[in-house]
Amino acid sequence: MDCLEGMKYIDDKSIDIVLSDIPYGINYDDWDVLHTNTNSALMGQSPAMKQTTFKKRSKPINGWNKADKRISYEYYSWCRQWCKELFRITKEASPILLFSSKRYLHRVCCALEDEGFLIRDILIWQKDRCHAKAQRINNVLHKRKIYDDIYNDYRIGNLAPMYEPIIWAMKPYSHTLTDCVLENKIGGFYGQNGIIPSNIFNCPINIKNKYHPTEKPLQLIKDLIKTFSIDNNHIILDMFIGSGTTAIACINTNRNYIGFEIEKRYFKIAKNRINKHILDNNLQDKYSLIV
């Protein structure tokens, strides 16, 4: 189900925590295309460009044009739609934890702010490894019969992406954070052994059976839940649940969850994965099987 439709059925001020790995809007796959750009020079797939020859990458072949510049704004506009619903259904001081791309992080933050949320921090997921892509420019220059030692090991592309940002936003509160903690047990974070936790979460990728191309480590999601949730009765919402990792993390930490997934193939994967986890651990009394 599309979360924009599904969230309409959620009561006002009923969600304690939002934790979601949102689409990044960088044309990673069909489900990550959130713009209407039909520029044939763009190596990203638009819903209006269904040709099989249309390559799935997020940069133009021969420079940017005016249509390309609208991509990030259209992504921002899309984010505002679900941010508006989040503001309605979350409680005062509810933490909003959203994975985001470095490229469009600012657009998500602006969408959250423009719908009323406060930005608290940018948390960091520090990886143990990554897949880096950067082309040696000599590979291109030599085809043009240009040879110059100055370009040895000079590259085009991105630096090795060893981290991913996680936006920590919060719904404003009318009294004090202490009141929010006493009323709903939200508004703060949980430290261990008297130590204030860092905003850098070190977690190896370590995903043995990968169900989704952008799947996050289960341990990382559990760590985020245990940092911001201290009540087993908390309801955690994931608007883009993908293969169901957030649901599994909620079950493993004895929390309640609500999730939405618009892609049928991933909904089926998530359903089977969650149901198997519930049955394997004899948790049918607490968690309902997905039909």
Give the role of each language-model region.
Residues M1-L279, D285, V291:
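Core catalytic lobe of class I
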